[in-house]
Each structure stands twice: as structure tokens, then as C-alpha cells.
Curated annotation (Swiss-Prot):
Gene expressing this chain: sufS
InterPro entries: Aminotrans_V_dom, Aminotrans_V_PyrdxlP_BS, Cys_dSase_SufS, PyrdxlP-dep_Trfase, PyrdxlP-dep_Trfase_major, PyrdxlP-dep_Trfase_small
Location of N6-(pyridoxal phosphate)lysine modifications: 226
Keyword annotations of the record: Cytoplasm, Lyase, Pyridoxal phosphate, Transferase
Protein family: Belongs to the class-V pyridoxal-phosphate-dependent aminotransferase family. Csd subfamily.
Pathway: Cofactor biosynthesis; iron-sulfur cluster biosynthesis
Role: Cysteine desulfurases mobilize the sulfur from L-cysteine to yield L-alanine, an essential step in sulfur metabolism for biosynthesis of a variety of sulfur-containing biomolecules. Component of the suf operon, which is activated and required under specific conditions such as oxidative stress and iron limitation. Acts as a potent selenocysteine lyase in vitro, that mobilizes selenium from L-selenocysteine. Selenocysteine lyase activity is however unsure in vivo.
Lineage, top ranks: Bacteria, Pseudomonadati, Pseudomonadota, Gammaproteobacteria, Enterobacterales
Pfam families in the cross-refs: Aminotran_5 (PF00266)
Any single biological process term in GO: cysteine metabolic process
Subunit structure: Homodimer. Interacts with SufE and the SufBCD complex composed of SufB, SufC and SufD. The interaction with SufE is required to mediate the direct transfer of the sulfur atom from the S-sulfanylcysteine.
Family matches, as NCBIfam families: PRK09295.1, sufS
GO MF annotations in UniProt: cysteine desulfurase activity; pyridoxal phosphate binding; selenocysteine lyase activity
Protein name: Cysteine desulfurase
Compartments it resides in: Cytoplasm
Organism, scientific name: Shigella boydii serotype 18 (strain CDC 3083-94 / BS512)
């Protein structure tokens, strides 16, 4: 189908509202994307007419809710081209997915003297769990350094990998710089050294198709709320053989086969042994609607539109005096910047007065801020519902702030 941004915008109720007396220009989708009516309605319909606890229930509502939940698992597996739906675990989001891997696979496979490799551009969610794991077991955390243009110093990889490397944990797309990392070569190199690879896909899956089989990564994780779905739900993909070997992380209902006070507990098979307790079934239903929504639009169509919009934005921002942009020319989704010597919070507050929503702060990437020697950045993110006119408003707003503040 032909991509129409006007038709897309009509599906998002919040985009019709005003902020400070001006039409909302929502440029903060990298933090959390807005939700189309199709997602809102699907979740509301489930709670109105179809809600029940899933699994084990013999009554109709429970059986139907279970079927709907498992159908979303199947849809998500097709979305990332997994071999099987049973390679996907429902998690609260990217952060929980990474922590699950660190506490299940990591505790079982990383030992004192081993090392894990991350990069200098990672979100805290792909730093802190590995720091905690390394501290627990006495392993080393190694870091791929950055180039000033926001790309990684890939030439250092050969010196970082050795026979003690157990994992490469790498972002697919930087949440600050928009850098898309060249995963294919990195994954091949990691596997040549016997290491597993976890990919943080939180900032990638909404921008273009992702094929986990083609990537050949061992773990891939993403959140629903950045993909126009609900909060509190995400997907962890793990290669099936690897997933079946992993011990459970959390204990409780739904993840057991048998429980005995005298003989202990046995686990059900994966992925269900990683889904203890009552799941966020409504969120799962909403995620399914979000996956269907972007799939119908076509991720290739979305990618083409967003690429054109990004090129336009970068071109227009060249007209803003004293504007510092961070990241490479070829980027996905986000534009991080500072205006002169003004603090990002001040710039963001002025933009909010103009009805423009951007993110300000360290963006859960403090090591990246330290590399650029700044306390914070502004970040405008471009999604499939953003327009050239909204880019123009951002540029005009920054020009106005420059005139006001100098």
C-alpha cells in the first residue's frame, strides 16, 4: 500500500491536541511512541468483553484469552522472522529482557576471568545488568570505543575478543546518536570466538524490518511501547536450543511443571518457564495490534518515508546558528543536539512553550555524555507520523531561541 502520513496521523488521537495553545509536534517517540486507535481499541475491547486469566482455565473466556495471547507470540515471531514462536518470551520491556538473560544465561555461563563486550554508546539497560553480572562472578566488562562522528571504532574489536569472551551485548541502533551498527560482521566475529550475541533492538524494530535468522544473533530484545504498542510489554527472542538450556530467573505460578514440599519443583518448558505469574495479557493484546498496524503499513514503506524526513531535517537544521549535532549523517530515528552553551533543559523548555515535545537529559546514556563532555543533550526523534511541517517548526523554534538567548 502507498504510505500516507495524513492517514497515519488520523489514527493517533493525541496528535490532534494542542499544547500551550499550539498544535502538538510530538518529537519524542524514541522515548515512547504514541498509540493508534487500533491499539487502544484492541486492548479496551479485550478488557470490556474478553478478559480472563490465561492458561489452565477450562472456561471459554480463559481459553479464548489464552489463544489470543499465544497468537500474538506467533505474530511477533513472524515480525522478526524467528524460526518458532517458542523462541519468544513475553517480558515487561527491553530492560527486563536483558536482565533475564544476564541472570539466567549469564549466571550459568559467565565465570571469573571471563569477559563481556559492550559499546560506549549503550543505553544503561545494556550496561548495568552486565556490570552487575561481572561484579557477581568476577568477570571483566570490555568496551568498544566511539569515534567522534558517533560510529564505533570497529578496528578495536579484534583486540577486545579473546578465548574468554562469553558475550557481545550491542545496540542495533543508538538511542542518542541514531547510529545503526553493522551487526552482521560483529556477530560473525563474536561467533568465531565462541561468544554469544545479544542485540538491543529497542530503537530498530519500528524503523525497518528485522530478521533474527539473517542476523544470526543469539538474543534479540525490544519493547512494545516504542513500537506504537502499550507500555509494560516486550519481546525477548532466544535461539531455541539456547533457551531450552537456560534456567528460570523468577519463580511462581505458570512456570512450573510440579511443586512438592518434599521433592522440590520442576519447571515447565521454555518459553513459559520464564513467564512466572499472571502476564500482562491486555498489553500483549495491544502489542499484537501494534504489530499488525505497522505490518499493514509496511515497514519498508515506513523506512522510506522516515529516511526522506530525516534527510530533510538534517538539511534544514544546518540553518540554525551555533547548533551542535551529535551522531553520523546516516542515522535512524533520532537527532541529538545542543544549542550554543545553553543547557538542554532550557532549550527543551522553550520548545515546549512552542508546542514541540523533545527529550532532554542524559537519555540513560551517561557514558556517552561523558565522551562528548556534556551534561545533557536535546533529542528530537522522528517517527512515521511526523511531518515536514513539524520539522520546520522545530527549526524555527531553535532559530527563535538563538535570537532570544544569543
Amino acid at each position: 500500500m502507498t504510505f500516507s502520513v495524513d492517514k497515519v496521523r488520523a489514527d493517533f488521537p493525541v496528535l490532534s491536541r494542542e499544547v500551550n495553545g499550539l498544535p502538538l509536534a510530538y518529537l519524542d517517540s524514541a522515548a515512547s511512541a504514541q498509540k493508534p486507535s487500533q491499539v487502544i481499541d484492541a486492548e479496551a475491547e479485550f478488557y470490556r468483553h474478553g478478559y480472563a486469566a490465561v492458561h489452565r482455565g477450562i472456561h471459554t473466556l480463559s481459553a479464548q484469552a489464552t489463544e489470543k495471547m499465544e497468537n500474538v507470540r506467533k505474530r511477533a515471531s513472524l515480525f522478526i522472522n524467528a524460526r518458532s514462536a517458542e523462541e519468544l518470551v513475553f517480558v515487561r520491556g527491553t530492560t527486563e529482557g536483558i536482565n533475564l538473560v544476564a541472570n539466567s544465561w549469564g549466571n550459568s555461563n559467565v565465570r571469573a576471568g571471563d569477559n563481556i563486550i559492550i559499546s560506549q554508546m549503550e543505553h544503561h539497560a545494556n550496561i548495568v545488568p552486565w556490570q552487575m553480572l561481572c561484579a557477581r562472578v568476577g568477570a571483566e566488562l570490555r568496551v568498544i570505543p566511539l569515534n567522534p562522528d558517533g560510529t564505533l571504532q570497529l578496528e578495536t574489536l579484534h583486540t577486545l575478543f579473546d578465548e574468554k569472551t562469553r558475550l557481545l551485548a550491542i545496540t542495533h541502533v543508538s538511542n542518542v546518536l541514531g547510529t545503526e551498527n553493522p551487526l552482521a560482521g560483529m556477530i560473525t566475529l563474536a561467533h568465531q570466538h565462541g561468544a554469544k550475541v545479544l542485540v538491543d533492538g529497542a530503537q530498530a524494530v519500528m524503523h525497518h524490518p528485522v530478521d533474527v535468522q539473517a542476523l544470526d544473533c543469539d538474543f534479540y530484545v525490544f519493547s512494545g511501547h516504542k513500537l506504537y504498542g502499550p507500555t509494560g510489554i516486550g519481546i525477548l527472542y532466544v535461539k531455541e536450543a539456547l533457551l531450552q538450556e537456560m534456567p528460570p530467573w523468577e519463580g511462581g505460578g505458570s512456570m512450573i511443571a510440579t511443586v512438592s514440599l518434599s521433592e522440590g519443583t520442576t519447571w515447565t518448558k521454555a518459553p513459559w518457564r520464564f513467564e512466572a505469574g499472571t502476564p500482562n495479557t491486555g498489553g500483549i493484546i495491544g502489542l499484537g495490534a501494534a504489530l499488525e498496524y505497522v505490518s499493514v503499513l509496511g515497514l519498508n514503506n515506513i523506512a522510506e518515508y522516515e529516511l526522506n524526513l530525516m534527510h530533510y531535517a538534517l538539511s534544514q537544521l544546518e540553518s540554525v546558528p551555533n547548533l551542535t549535532l551529535y551522531g553520523p549523517q546516516n542515522r535512524l530515528g533520532v537527532i541529538a543536539f545542543n544549542l550554543g552553551k545553553h543547557h538542554a533543559y532550557d532549550v527543551g523548555s522553550f520548545l515546549d512553550n512552542y508546542g514541540i515535545a523533545v527529550r532532554t537529559g542524559h537519555h540513560c546514556a551517561m557514558p556517552l555524555m561523558a565522551y562528548y563532555n556534556v551534561p545533557a543533550m536535546c533529542r528530537a526523534s522522528l517517527a512515521m507520523y511526523n511531518t515536514h511541517e513539524e520539522v520546520d517548526r522545530l527549526v524555527t523554534g531553535l532559530q527563535r531561541i538563538h535570537r532570544l538567548l544569543g
